[in-house]
């Protein structure tokens, strides 16, 4: 499980401030709220890359540097930081650029096969950040995890935000397709074949007693 600080960062300063505000007269409290920035991180207010990194710090296939005392001290990443500066994320598509990966592959040439399919897609459950990093929706657009997911106002099953089990998840960006979705899908509107994610986010891994969808979000390719 996770706690508030996993997504919102260290909270002691925030808690102390709220206690202080509660003791203030209304007038002083309003002035303090207007003049002092919040000391807590709100992932939805970050840019789409930093916001996604908050989730990716747990939901990414990362490599642990044994020289760090992470078993005793935890990871140095904190929400709002640049995850790429502290946490190596294994990406087969960038294996040649990830110099730290070379000695690992020399020691175990098949290690990527343990975590990824032959096409580079993640095969381990709960590591959807790896898929999203490869998605044009994230690379070229502004899609983040919170584009579709909500941690507080959702059903715990998949934690999808309201309406995100439908094509609205994709149509919030691809508005030009909303008037005639079947012209794109070639299937009857509201049918399973006309659901965007059934083609662009197929089930590619299994875990948590169910199949998990790919988050690479790409055009289907039979090859």
Regions found by a protein language model. Give the residues of each.
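Primarily the internal scaffold of c-type cytochrome electron-transfer domains
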Residues: 1-223
